[in-house]
Amino acid sequence: MSSGNAKIGHPAPSFKATAVMPDGQFKDISLSDYKGKYVVFFFYPLDFTFVCPTEIIAFSDRAEEFKKLNCQVIGASVDSHFCHLAWINTPKKQGGLGPMNIPLVSDPKRTIAQDYGVLKADEGISFRGLFIIDDKGILRQITINDLPVGRSVDEILRLVQAFQFTDKHGEVCPAGWKPGSDTIKPDVNKSKEYFSKQK
């Protein structure tokens, strides 16, 4: 795995690349296009594989939930945009993706994967890296899975909601926090209000 330039609390590495958009067209997009929105940017190893379509379809199927949070989901792999399009045009029952509600970025030179520290250099593919970038372009969360295990869309939604809550209210979110749950005031005395309710 490459070390990369992605660091929590710092600007996310910028990129410009060709993507297959939800309308099936090719378009050059960059991270800066999404300034003012949260971005969930996730890498997957390869098109036409096994775990990858389950993750991509899960994110695509719930793209509207992210959109309601002013959050754009973007997928990326080292495959060409032509390969992405062929996979999108392959029926789900044949291992394809079917129509997508999220852009899929092409990173054939592996520069984006390297910048984000997810390149598995010996195979020339990406680990399952996922990055939550806030509306100011600051990297707030990083997870990187080894190849055989997919990610949870529920957890990513929860994390986006939690970061947005802390941005807005200045309180911090305890383990397992969900919207509507108690939060903690980040102050020695005021935090007792939360802890006094614990069993």
Swiss-Prot record:
More details = The active site is a conserved redox-active cysteine residue, the peroxidatic cysteine (C(P)), which makes the nucleophilic attack on the peroxide substrate. The peroxide oxidizes the C(P)-SH to cysteine sulfenic acid (C(P)-SOH), which then reacts with another cysteine residue, the resolving cysteine (C(R)), to form a disulfide bridge. The disulfide is subsequently reduced by an appropriate electron donor to complete the catalytic cycle. In this typical 2-Cys peroxiredoxin, C(R) is provided by the other dimeric subunit to form an intersubunit disulfide.
Q: What is this protein called?
A: Peroxiredoxin-1
Sites of the Glycyl lysine isopeptide (Lys-Gly) (interchain with G-Cter in SUMO2) crosslink: 7, 120
What catalytic reaction does the record list? Answer: a hydroperoxide + [thioredoxin]-dithiol = an alcohol + [thioredoxin]-disulfide + H2O
Report the function annotation for this chain. Answer: Thiol-specific peroxidase that catalyzes the reduction of hydrogen peroxide and organic hydroperoxides to water and alcohols, respectively. Plays a role in cell protection against oxidative stress by detoxifying peroxides and as sensor of hydrogen peroxide-mediated signaling events. Might participate in the signaling cascades of growth factors and tumor necrosis factor-alpha by regulating the intracellular concentrations of H(2)O(2). Reduces an intramolecular disulfide bond in GDPD5 that gates the ability to GDPD5 to drive postmitotic motor neuron differentiation.
Segments forming domain Thioredoxin = 6-165
* Residues forming the catalytic site: 52
Say which species the protein is native to: Rattus norvegicus (Rat)
Question: Where is it found, in Gene Ontology cellular component terms?
Answer: cytoplasm; cytosol; euchromatin; mitochondrial matrix; nucleus; peroxisomal matrix
